[in-house]
Amino acid sequence: MAAEDFLTIFLDDDESWNETLNMSGYDYSGNFSLEVSVCEMTTVVPYTWNVGILSLIFLINVLGNGLVTYIFCKHRSRAGAIDILLLGICLNSLCLSISLLAEVLMFLFPNIISTGLCRLEIFFYYLYVYLDIFSVVCVSLVRYLLVAYSTRSWPKKQSLGWVLTSAALLIALVLSGDACRHRSRVVDPVSKQAMCYENAGNMTADWRLHVRTVSVTAGFLLPLALLILFYALTWCVVRRTKLQARRKVRGVIVAVVLLFFVFCFPYHVLNLLDTLLRRRWIRDSCYTRGLINVGLAVTSLLQALYSAVVPLIYSCLGSLFRQRMYGLFQSLRQSFMSGATT
């Protein structure tokens, strides 16, 4: 790889090869040219720490989401619409595991870098980005339907969950396939190392800007607007009705929104600012670039951690997962206690 740790190298734009190595959302911004002046170089996370953090997130992701997926498959006949959507979120987080695994392998073994591996890594990353947020939107929609039509049975059926999950998956597949079209293996003209880069010929800069713009609009602004709409509608319905589970519904709304804003919102805001900077809609400077790119490096790790931890938290919102996970932990506890006494 051209960057072996979270390095942010800023060079002049006029006669340089503008580059941002977006590996699973971890932005390594650098502009390569034979005659350039370096503005600033900031080390955010050392190489060994970087690999260790990604590996830890990978393990937590696989174990946690694998456990939830196992519980669903074992008791899928009892699943409702929310449970189907939560399963989609867990499986989607496993997609990020594939991207993280490919990224770590390319860090450790640069010789294996190929166009196919580059496209695989970025495809599963964008699939995670789009499918995750649209799945959360679908969860908010089902929550609204369950509250607004609490006397009806159709919002609880599996068929609604499968329809919404399929729709979110279709949108994510189209957007992810578009994002990885020009991803390929190239050689850094300075370090002579292989790396993954969007290679669209003379249109490379425009293409990269297009990908980032679509990511900001379709992966953040539109879903955020839908989240606000559905949870606002749910809140209004809860306030004007006398639901027995009124306090519980409010708690779910606060929990889901709070988790999204803590783990994902900072990265998306910085990604939006970075896109505006590249479009020259805000004033460009080395200081501004430094702040944005350091922030992107840190918040992208937070977003990756979200994929590993939040599905387990979301599992508590679905009755199937909550009851079965509680039963599983009780069985493990009893087995441990009986083994300790013998």
UniProtKB/Swiss-Prot annotation:
Disulfide bonds: none annotated. Keywords: G-protein coupled receptor, Glycoprotein, Host cell membrane, Host membrane, Membrane, Receptor, Transducer, Transmembrane, Transmembrane helix. Residues 1-51, 114-121, 181-217, 273-293 are extracellular. The chain crosses the membrane at residues 52-72, 93-113, 122-142, 160-180, 218-238, 252-272, 294-314. It is a multi-pass membrane protein. Residues 73-92, 143-159, 239-251, 315-342 are cytoplasmic. The keyword Glycoprotein applies. It is found in: Host cell membrane. Glycans are attached at N18, N22, N31. One of its GO terms (molecular function) is C-C chemokine receptor activity. Its main location: host cell. GO terms for biological process: calcium-mediated signaling; cell chemotaxis; immune response; positive regulation of cytosolic calcium ion concentration. It holds the Pfam family 7tm_1. It comes from the Viruses. InterPro entries: CCR1-9-like (IPR050119), GPCR_Rhodpsn (IPR000276), GPCR_Rhodpsn_7TM (IPR017452). GO terms for cellular component: host cell plasma membrane; membrane. Receptor that signals constitutively via several signaling pathways including PI3K/AKT as well as mitogen- and stress-activated/MAP kinases. Promotes host cell proliferation and survival, modulates cell migration, stimulates angiogenesis, and recruits inflammatory cells, both in expressing cells and in neighboring cells. Maintains chronic activation of NF-kappa-B via interaction with host CADM1. Belongs to the G-protein coupled receptor 1 family. Interacts with protein K7; this interaction promotes vGPCR proteasomal degradation. Interacts with host CADM1; this interaction is essential for chronic NF-kappa-B activation. This is viral G-protein coupled receptor. It comes from Human herpesvirus 8 type P (isolate GK18) (HHV-8). The gene is ORF74.
